[in-house]
């Protein structure tokens, strides 16, 4: 890569980051003004216990959005485990464990909808 190509790539990355930050700030303000305009669909595959990476990567933000009044739907993607693994293992226990982890992290079933993909 030449210096000019490297500079252009850096410039493009910086511009993209700046646009992303600006858009995030706009959405954040809009949520503060009227959280009922927003809905989030998120979830995990029940392949084992959640860990700190899940918490800092997504769970913390899910709880924050829920607490701000965003309509929050949390999917337990059990069908994905069934279709993309050689064996499903103890899927029932893993689904229950995942829901327990959600509750422990602060997902409130009174304010969020938690559901299994296989139940839809």
Spans of features found by a protein language model:
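Non-catalytic terminal extensions that flank enzyme cores
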Residues: 1-48, 67, 109
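N-terminal catalytic cores of NTP/NDP-binding nucleotidyl/phosphoryl-transfer enzymes
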Residues: 30-92
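A glycine-rich helix N-cap at a beta->alpha junction
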Residues: 93-114
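Internal, well-ordered alpha/beta segment that forms a basic, Gly-enriched binding/recognition surface
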Residues: 115-120
């Amino acid at each position: 890569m030449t210096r000019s190509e490297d500079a252009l790539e850096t410039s493009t990355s910086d511009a993209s980051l700046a646009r992303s930050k600006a858009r995030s700030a706009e959405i954040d303000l809009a949520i503060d003004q009227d959280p009922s305009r927003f809905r989030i669909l998120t979830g995990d595959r029940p392949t084992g216990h959640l860990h700190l990476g899940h918490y800092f990567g997504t769970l913390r933000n899910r709880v924050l959005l829920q607490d701000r009044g965003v309509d929050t739907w949390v999917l337990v993607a059990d069908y994905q485990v069934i279709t993309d693994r050689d064996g499903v293992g103890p899927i029932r226990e893993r689904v229950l464990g995942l829901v327990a982890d959600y509750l422990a992290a602060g997902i409130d079933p009174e304010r969020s909808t938690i559901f299994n993909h296989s139940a839809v």
